[in-house]
Curated annotation (Swiss-Prot):
One cellular component term from this protein's GO annotations in UniProt: cytosolic small ribosomal subunit
Entry protein name: Small ribosomal subunit protein uS17
Superkingdom classification of source: Bacteria
Gene Ontology terms: biological process: translation
Gene3D superfamilies: Nucleic acid-binding proteins
Gene: rpsQ
InterPro entries, sorted: NA-bd_OB-fold, Ribosomal_uS17, Ribosomal_uS17_bact/chlr, Ribosomal_uS17_CS
NCBIfam families assigned: PRK05610.1 (NF004123), uS17_bact (TIGR03635)
HAMAP family referenced in this protein's UniProt entry, alphabetically: Ribosomal_uS17_B
Family: Belongs to the universal ribosomal protein uS17 family.
Amino acid sequence: MEQKRGMRKTRIGVVVSDKMDKTVVVAVETLVQHPLYKKTIKRTTKFKAHDENNECRVGDKVLIMETRPLSKEKRWRVVQILERAK
């Protein structure tokens, strides 16, 4: 029997912290509609992501992908740095 891996989720966000070793905190903004008033609101979610070579810096725009649990709170990894901080 061959097991097939499902599609992994990807998100684009901005690095807000790089203080930890091999870990960065990525803030991902999503637009949601208020259920009653129908106004579009920005929601920010912070994900801890694995950064193997400590390449990311605060302000970098990165692509993160879901992965197996790497620690208590870390379930994402940095796939690519899309844009460097200025």
